[in-house]
């Protein structure tokens, strides 16, 4: 069943979080969403959605935003007009190297995802919506949590660690660390300070990539 949570924290930024963006990713991120407590949020209006399984269409393709699910997400964005917009995704851990490779710029015209550690990845949102549905002052983030498909589902925790040097608990800790950075930030300046303190390397990469895609005068988030 789809999940929705609203938190009225008074005056402050509007924050929209969406999990289960496409495919069956919602089952991976819902347990993480439920780890967030009331104390994890800044003042403001908080809206959290996690959707059931839908057909998988990549958000870097315009066909996604023409689909029923894509239109639903755009309607939420245009309705709430969030100051902070965060997509909560999961991905097949086998694709880690491909998703973080600079070859994505040549093959797909988009920058690679950025490694935050423990197989957790971050980036901005799809270029197809970043400028059309948001302002430069808005914070737009994508967070990706590692998941498993196919034969990997049959491996034990020890076997997964041996194959990928992967720990579920450490990935959860890293994912929640970045997610709480977003949930706790009171505005763009606060977010910038938190990112530069805890994720300086990733922030520098984000700036490099945004210059390639949007030019010099566009924010990295």
Label each residue range with its predicted role.
Residues 1-221:
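Structured catalytic-domain cores with a bias toward divalent-metal coordination
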């Amino acid at each position: 069943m789809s999940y929705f949570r609203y938190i009225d924290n008074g005056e402050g930024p509007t924050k929209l979080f969406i999990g289960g963006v496409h495919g069956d990713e919602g089952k991976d991120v819902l347990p993480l969403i439920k780890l967030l407590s009331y104390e994890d949020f800044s003042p403001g209006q908080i809206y959290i959605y996690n959707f059931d399984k839908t057909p998988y269409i990549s958000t870097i393709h315009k066909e996604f935003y023409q689909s029923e699910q894509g239109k639903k997400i755009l309607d939420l964005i245009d309705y709430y007009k969030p100051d902070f917009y965060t997509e909560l995704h999961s991905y097949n851990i086998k694709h880690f190297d491909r998703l973080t490779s600079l070859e994505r710029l040549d093959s797909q015209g988009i920058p690679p995802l950025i490694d935050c550690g423990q197989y957790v990845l971050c980036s901005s949102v799809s270029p197809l919506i970043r400028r059309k549905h948001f302002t430069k002052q808005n914070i737009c983030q994508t967070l990706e949590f590692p998941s498993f498909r196919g034969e990997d589902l049959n491996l034990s925790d020890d076997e997964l660690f041996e194959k990928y040097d992967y720990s579920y608990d450490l990935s959860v800790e890293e994912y929640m660390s970045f997610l709480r950075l977003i949930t706790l930030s009171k505005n763009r300046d606060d977010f910038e300070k938190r990112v530069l303190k805890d994720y300086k390397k990733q922030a520098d990469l984000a700036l490099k990539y945004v210059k390639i895609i949007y030019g010099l005068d566009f924010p990295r988030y």
